[in-house]
Design a protein with these regions (language model features):
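Glycine-/charge-enriched secondary-structure boundary and capping motifs
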Residues: 3-153
């Protein structure tokens, strides 16, 4: 990426950033365990998906029964800027970005619809950003990412 984009790791992460590209790429992983344990105490969680390599589809599919699909709506959460920078610098198609990176959703919790708003509140109270990003519907064990134009909280 550095060669293709003609970027130096010590340069600003993006125009106006006050930290380097290297610092952004080496940002430590978020530890979700305490917040997810609290969520499990407060809400009947059906499943957790830790989104690592394989992106959202590759990790969420592991917790889906064969009779359900997960519909995830892009644009309802705040994607960290580094992902658009990587995509632009590498001319990476949307589909590849979705299958490689977590795009800012490091942990997904599947909860009953009636508990969803409370789940968001619990996770936010634990110090993490949280959004309602989709729903579970009848299906065949697939993850489908859809688009929404503007982020919402």
């Amino acid at each position: 990426m550095f060669d293709r984009a003609q970027r130096d790791p010590s340069s600003a992460a993006w125009p106006g950033a006050h930290h380097s590209l290297a610092a952004e790429l080496l940002r430590p992983s978020v530890i979700y365990a305490p917040a997810m344990l609290e969520l499990a105490r407060e809400v009947p969680v059906h499943a957790f998906a830790h989104v690592t390599g394989g992106g959202i589809p590759g990790n969420l599919v592991r917790v889906l029964p064969d009779r359900c699909d997960a519909l995830v709506t892009r644009g309802v959460w705040d994607e960290p800027r580094i992902f658009s920078e990587i995509q632009q610098a590498g001319a990476v198609p949307d589909d590849e970005m979705e299958h490689v990176f977590n795009l800012g959703l490091g942990m997904l919790a599947i909860v009953p619809p009636e508990a969803a708003l409370h789940a968001v509140d619990v996770v936010r109270a634990a110090g993490h950003d949280a959004w309602l990003v989709g729903e579970i519907v009848d299906g065949h064990g697939r993850v489908r990412l859809e688009r929404r134009a503007t982020p919402r909280r």
